[in-house]
């Protein structure tokens, strides 16, 4: 969740994002960065830079390396540089410079992936990074890109050169033709891979439909309806076994869908009437909850299989529990920016 150029809540938060298994989340601030355990909520690291802001923080599971990009009113680093921070040494150990602004960074143990506004560059994760690949994309100001963290699967997915298309490449075998998925007619707003790299979920700027595809064949597996009105999708995430997905939007709601068992999702009683528009046969979320503040948020599943977390731009943290019937209740509320190690 990128809150640049300005977070309307005035709390100094510029960026929030989960690590690869959603066990932690990192925040870029106007004065440094912070790392939290996601569930249970606990501040793990607070690095203050009195002289500058961090607009992007990318973790690598729970290891000591983080990718930082400067941002905010007084960026700590130039926004066209990726800095790899070693949290044991408390300093940057790798620096990669580009001719244009960095939109996002993705990490796996052997690769650094840097997203620019119309291309993606892949480097070795070594002390002197070596450029391996360059992939063209359509104009990609949001820096959309997902990298499978699984050691047995090196898939990288990003917007293709055609509007609404997703391209999937295997970094372990770039001779293999990429999988090209015409996911949506409109511009992509969000993409997400499951941990195993077998499924990809997509949404367009219209934000009414979420589509799930098989990454090896590109075949559509499920089409899910978030709502009938257009929405800006902030986040999509799978749970650990890819049986569920959660979706957050600017309508202040987080929806939970069954990704593997479509019978769990709600459907109109008119769904079987062949003469009615496709809308009536849509599969709707089986559970949803409202984020009380309505603030932009990212979402992921918690440590319990029936828990969903929401990390919000106003500094609020919510944990909701849902049951088989789809009923939802709030379990935890906290203000994560106001936490310190002493309070926990």
Curated annotation (Swiss-Prot):
GO terms for cellular component: cytosol; lysosome; phagophore assembly site; phagophore assembly site membrane. GO terms for biological process: autophagosome assembly; autophagy of mitochondrion; cellular response to starvation; glycophagy; nucleophagy; pexophagy; protein localization to phagophore assembly site. SUPFAM superfamilies: WD40 repeat-like. WD repeats lie at residues 183-223, 228-267. GO terms for molecular function: phosphatidylinositol-3,5-bisphosphate binding; phosphatidylinositol-3-phosphate binding; protein-macromolecule adaptor activity. It is found in: Preautophagosomal structure; Lysosome. Keywords: Autophagy, Lipid-binding, Lysosome, Repeat, WD repeat. A motif (L/FRRG motif) lies at residues 224-227. Component of the autophagy machinery that controls the major intracellular degradation process by which cytoplasmic materials are packaged into autophagosomes and delivered to lysosomes for degradation. Binds phosphatidylinositol 3-phosphate (PtdIns3P), and other phosphoinositides including PtdIns(3,5)P2, forming on membranes of the endoplasmic reticulum upon activation of the upstream ULK1 and PI3 kinases and is recruited at phagophore assembly sites where it regulates the elongation of nascent phagophores downstream of WIPI2. The L/FRRG motif is required for recruitment to PtdIns3P. Belongs to the WD repeat PROPPIN family. This is WD repeat domain phosphoinositide-interacting protein 3. It comes from Gallus gallus (Chicken). The gene is WDR45B.
């Amino acid at each position: 969740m990128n809150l640049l150029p300005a977070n309307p809540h005035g709390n100094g938060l510029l960026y929030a994002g989960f690590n690869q298994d959603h066990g932690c989340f990192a925040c870029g601030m106007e004065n440094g960065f912070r790392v939290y355990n996601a569930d249970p909520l606990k501040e793990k690291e607070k690095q203050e830079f009195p002289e500058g802001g961090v607009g992007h923080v990318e973790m690598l599971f729970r290891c000591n390396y983080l990718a930082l990009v400067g941002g905010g009113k007084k960026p700590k680093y130039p926004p066209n540089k990726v800095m790899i921070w070693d949290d044991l040494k408390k300093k940057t150990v790798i620096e990669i410079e580009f001719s244009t602004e960095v939109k996002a960074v993705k990490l796996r143990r052997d690769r650094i992936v840097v997203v620019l506004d119309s291309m993606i560059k892949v480097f070795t994760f070594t002390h002197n990074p070596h450029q391996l690949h360059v992939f063209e994309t359509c104009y990609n100001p949001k820096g959309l890109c997902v990298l499978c963290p699984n050691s047995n699967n090196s898939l990288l997915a990003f917007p293709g050169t055609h509007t609404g298309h997703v391209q999937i490449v295997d970094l372990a075998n770039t001779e293999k033709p990429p999988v090209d998925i015409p996911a949506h007619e409109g511009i992509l707003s969000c993409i997400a891979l499951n941990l195993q790299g077998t499924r990809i979920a997509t949404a367009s700027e219209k934000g009414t439909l979420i589509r799930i595809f098989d990454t090896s064949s590109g075949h559509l597996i499920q089409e899910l309806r978030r709502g009938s009105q257009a929405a800006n999708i902030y986040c999509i995430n799978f749970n650990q076994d890819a049986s569920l997905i959660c979706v957050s939007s600017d309508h202040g709601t987080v929806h939970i869908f069954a990704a593997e068992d479509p019978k769990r999702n709600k459907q109109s009683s008119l769904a079987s009437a062949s003469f009615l528009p496709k809308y009536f046969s849509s599969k709707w979320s089986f559970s949803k909850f409202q984020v009380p503040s309505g603030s932009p948020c990212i979402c992921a599943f918690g440590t319990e299989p029936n828990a969903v977390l929401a990390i919000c731009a106003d500094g609020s943290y919510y944990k909701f529990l849902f049951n088989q019937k789809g009923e939802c209740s709030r379990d935890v509320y906290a203000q994560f920016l106001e936490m310190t190690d002493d309070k926990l």
